Amino acid sequence: MEKFRVIGSDKPLVGEVTISGAKNAALPILFASILAEEPVEVANVPHLRDIDTTMELLKRLGAKVSRNGSVHVDPSSINEYCAPYDLVKTMRASIWALGPLVARFGQGQVSLPGGCAIGARPVDLHITGLEQLGATITLEDGYVKAEVDGRLKGAHIVMDKVSVGATITIMCAAALAEGTTTLDNAAREPEIVDTADFLNTLGAKISGAGTDTITIEGVERLGGGKHNVVADRIETGTFLVAAAVSGGKVVCRNTNAHLLEAVLAKLEEAGALVETGEDWISVDMTDRELKAVSIRTAPHPGFPTDMQAQFTLLNMMAKGGGVITETIFENRFMHVPELMRMGAKAEIEGNTVICGDVDSLSGAQVMATDLRASASLVIAGCIAKGETIVDRIYHIDRGYDKIENKLSALGANIERVSEAG
């Protein structure tokens, strides 16, 4: 099993990072390609384990899939309609195959998925949405099965809870439904907008993505097309926090400040000098004092839960401590005990963590528990005294494209080592 060995330093992280395409847009877009009857090309797709798994799943369904810079998918040859357990057991995103399969082929089944262990992420909202579009759903032998005679039917759907995943499932399925679907209380994340833009490129008629009401006029078929995946706002935020906690200056290229306004506002509140351009963001913490900030996670455009772990670290290193409240997922403070092994001070009370401030961290052996928590541990290792070993880094490989190379380019001393190393 691979690990990261990080030798900490008081030297600030300085330089430029090219941000990859967003995993949380690339995954639903690749699954949405099932809806097309002609080849599609998806550019700016990150090199991640979940992307590789999705490409393999599309191949297993019968699609022709290749990668040469962009990912090319020809879904015209799909002749299987089941996403099997051996492929989806590590990835919750696999549920996104269900809507496109039943919408285009009248049937689909997906093994109940796996992924990060960060609380309840039920597929109920996906199932309810598909049922409201006319699908018959059954649960058998660990599989969710969806069927419909003819086409799905447009409907007025009011979501019980704001859900990014279910919003995408319903939007994709409704694209080929008969009639118009109105989706109220929809999630507003940029990755939903990007998925809608992709579908519209193929001939879908979707409006309102990015607001809490999305309207989908169903069409009979979708053709081919080319799409460029939106920048990864969470990877962007992660490197900006790395600059802040190390007292450095980092410029993120190939990104968009409009995607993470809540994060940039908190970085400025923390004392960072934030500058932005059309496709870049910089954070400069040189000779500036890091100040604690209070964070409350919320659906977009609020503060993203996927940046909570990174700001937990920031608050631990800032003057005054800080309070972070997690409202999206339960059980998402598993990074806190690991950071405390490195000398951080914190107290967890329910869905809130109260951070104490410390002058420095010490290297330790720590364990990654989920995707974003692992990023905070790696950054902590970069600024700690001594050697930090981060175990179970397969979590980080699910969401960060070559993070060790990008950190090394900023001056970090980090390497990937095998168990024997």
Swiss-Prot record:
It comes from the Bacteria. The modification 2-(S-cysteinyl)pyruvic acid O-phosphothioketal is found at residue 116. Phosphoenolpyruvate binds at residues 23-24. It is found in: Cytoplasm. Its main location: cytoplasm. It catalyses: phosphoenolpyruvate + UDP-N-acetyl-alpha-D-glucosamine = UDP-N-acetyl-3-O-(1-carboxyvinyl)-alpha-D-glucosamine + phosphate. InterPro entries: Enolpyruvate_Tfrase_dom (IPR001986), Enolpyruvate_Tfrase_sf (IPR036968), MurA_subfamily (IPR050068), RNA3'P_cycl/enolpyr_Trfase_a/b (IPR013792), UDP_GlcNAc_COvinyl_MurA (IPR005750). GO terms for cellular component: cytoplasm. Pfam families: EPSP_synthase (PF00275). GO terms for biological process: cell division; cell wall organization; peptidoglycan biosynthetic process; regulation of cell shape; UDP-N-acetylgalactosamine biosynthetic process. CDD domains: UdpNAET. It is an enzyme of class 2 (transferase). Its EC number is 2.5.1.7. One of its GO terms (molecular function) is UDP-N-acetylglucosamine 1-carboxyvinyltransferase activity. UDP-N-acetyl-alpha-D-glucosamine binds at residues 92, 121-125, 161-164, 306, 328. Pathway: Cell wall biogenesis; peptidoglycan biosynthesis. Gene3D superfamilies: Enolpyruvate transferase domain. Transmembrane segments: none annotated. Cell wall formation. Adds enolpyruvyl to UDP-N-acetylglucosamine. Belongs to the EPSP synthase family. MurA subfamily. This is UDP-N-acetylglucosamine 1-carboxyvinyltransferase. It comes from Vibrio campbellii (strain ATCC BAA-1116).
